Amino acid sequence: MISSIDHIVLTASDLDKTIAFYCDVLGMTLEDFTPSDGGEVRKSLKFGNQKINLHNAKSPFKPHANNPVSGAVDICFLSSKTMEEWNNIFSENKIEIEDGPVRKTGATGPIMSLYVRDPDLNLIEISKLFFLTKACILDSILKISAFKLFLA
């Protein structure tokens, strides 16, 4: 049975730009590794317990996807930072926010998300788990009740 994802592969048209975006903007760590077959040294981006292996679009490592192209990925990353902090980071780096913050449904429940594009125009969703506290729920109920009274 499948229990988790170990890594994914990202095909990049310009490794330097890709590394700068994921490391300098998103805060991932660049790591070099040598495959167990002793092949060419490769690069990966580490974050948490996961990693993204990088393939150069001009010469992807084998084996590789049937049609390895850059710009075809849509991925969601979970973060401990607030949406306001991410908004500031993207603003400082002159990265346009395509959408958000918006509430979405993630693998483990509600999330708040911002959407941006990486240098290859992959869709990058940055999310924070969204917990409804009792105070937040009560506040929403009171606002709805007040609005209903206003309409009556």
Please provide the spans of the model-predicted regions.
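N-terminal beta-strand motif that seeds the catalytic metal site of vicinal oxygen chelate
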Residues: 1-17, 73-75, 130-135, 152
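A short, acidic/glycine-rich surface segment
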Residues: 59-64, 100, 104
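Vicinal oxygen chelate
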Residues: 1, 4-13, 43-46, 64-141, 149-152
